[in-house]
Amino acid sequence: VAGIMREIRKRDLDIALYQYNSYGNWSKDALHNIGEYNIYNLPDFSEYDGVILDCSNISDQKQKRKIINKLHETGLPVVSIELEEEEFHCISIDNYGPIIELMHHMYEKHDCRRFVFAGGPKNAFGNRRRARAYKQCIEEFGLKLDENPILYGEYDYNTGVRYMREFVEQKRKLPDVFVCVNDNIAAGICTEAEKNGYQVPCDFKVTGFDNLDKAAFFRPQITTVCLNREEIGSACVDILMRIWNGEEVPAKSYVKS
């Protein structure tokens, strides 16, 4: 939102911005979550000229699909963040290059030879790109993917807890580094590791992605990739302005991380 507002002020635009957000993922009470998600039924889209959609934190796939279908029905231009969808304009960071750099850093500077990619949803746009970069590096290093697996789950903290708990309970050999698809999963792994007597980064290393506040203030501090959210917000406004001006806009656009 900060990036959106910055671009609006920079261009001195007369734009009214309305934000609809929910905390439907935060409770295990299904009825509570339904109530939270009801906020998406409030907007009268006939009063709007465009939509910026970020549903990366909506873990309920049926709810996510419901929102997407509703936006399709409006006929409005939609700029979607990290979501490939027919007729939407997708804006994304470079999910590929930073993982390549991170993997080489861990391999060359920290002598890591056993890896685990602690991923999110298998079909999520960002997760697919980051997992593909990870796989490329594993092959480049001459390692076997079955010995350096890719794990799939959600994008949340509890997924990281689950990954670590499974390693402990199944007495699996721990990797030199958990390459996490985001900082939430990294934090979950670190917390569960500490509960089981492990010390990060002494016993193994954990990396994140997104550069959330928790990466900076978490102990141990998590090595992470900076996701420039403000630039994404700024780019969303630029795309909508070009659409409103009748310009041709590519289906996908990228912002450097």
Enumerate the language-model features and the residues they cover.
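Conserved acidic residues
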Residues: D49-G50, R113, D176-V177
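Glycine-rich phosphate/diphosphate-binding loops that line cofactor/substrate pockets in enzymes
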Residues: M103-F115
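Hinge/beta->alpha junction and helix N-cap segments in small-molecule ligand-binding domains
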Residues: Y18-G35, C55-S59, C90-E101, F117-R165, ...
